[in-house]
């Protein structure tokens, strides 16, 4: 029987702050911050190559009951479905948005899987401006 990949939790503030320097993947239900650990960091934390995940639900989302409900939904979605897509030796922080509370569970799991596997993708059709625009007239003069 194939053993499940163990997903560990981020619990310390320093771990959350380290992940903030990584890649950010935005979605309608949450923001996902992703950072790959170096081998030295994995050895120091004694985590091996297991992925780690942390959850942030701010007071802007509601009172403690609502925040905990959002956190529980995200944890269950990771445990049941999206955890299998997580890369080894990678830390994930999920910053929940208010819409995560009322979204259908299937949509939540699909969005999590999409954000976990979307490595460095940019929206096509949008060009980044590389040069500053020419200065135009001030106040229509």
Swiss-Prot record:
Listed Basic and acidic residues bias regions: 114-123
SUPFAM superfamilies for this protein: Ribosomal protein S5 domain 2-like
GO CC terms of this entry: ribonuclease P complex
InterPro entries: Ribosomal_Su5_D2-typ_SF, Ribsml_uS5_D2-typ_fold_subgr, RNase_P, RNase_P_CS
Catalytic activity: Endonucleolytic cleavage of RNA, removing 5'-extranucleotides from tRNA precursor
Function: RNaseP catalyzes the removal of the 5'-leader sequence from pre-tRNA to produce the mature 5'-terminus. It can also cleave other RNA substrates such as 4.5S RNA. The protein component plays an auxiliary but essential role in vivo by binding to the 5'-leader sequence and broadening the substrate specificity of the ribozyme.
Protein name per Swiss-Prot or TrEMBL: Ribonuclease P protein component
Record organism: Brucella suis biovar 1 (strain 1330)
Lineage: Bacteria, Pseudomonadati, Pseudomonadota, Alphaproteobacteria, Hyphomicrobiales
Protein's gene: rnpA
């Amino acid at each position: 029987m194939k053993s499940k990949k163990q997903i560990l939790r981020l619990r310390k503030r320093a771990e959350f702050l380290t992940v903030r320097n990584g890649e950010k993947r935005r979605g309608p239900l949450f923001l996902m911050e992703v950072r790959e650990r170096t081998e030295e960091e994995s050895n120091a934390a004694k985590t091996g190559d297991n992925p780690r995940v942390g959850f942030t639900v701010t007071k802007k989302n509601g009172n403690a009951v609502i925040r905990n409900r959002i956190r529980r939904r995200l944890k269950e979605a990771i445990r049941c479905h999206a955890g299998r897509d997580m890369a080894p030796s990678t830390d994930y922080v999920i910053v929940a948005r208010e819409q995560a509370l009322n979204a259908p569970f299937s949509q939540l799991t699909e969005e999590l899987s999409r954000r976990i596997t979307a490595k460095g993708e940019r929206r096509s059709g949008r060009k980044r401006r590389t040069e500053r625009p020419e200065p135009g007239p001030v106040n229509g003069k």
